[in-house]
């Protein structure tokens, strides 16, 4: 549990992500991926998917995650929409796959 999240929390988040066929992969980054998180650290996830992975989908996922009443803030982004080169390099360097859509 390098990222400091209980497995039950991870499974709840993965269950939400799995309900959205637009999400092909979720990558955990930030302090939780680096292992230098604090108890209340947020959960930074960037998502990979096709052209149908839009901000509207992100908002729906965030609404579903909010209903879980998790004791953590969850920040979602779409990897292909990130323009900050430093953030992209950080994700490439420390990011870990958190969820992957099952192959048919």
Each PLM stretch: what is its role?
Residues 1-25, 34-39, 50-104:
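Catalytic core of pol beta-like nucleotidyltransferases
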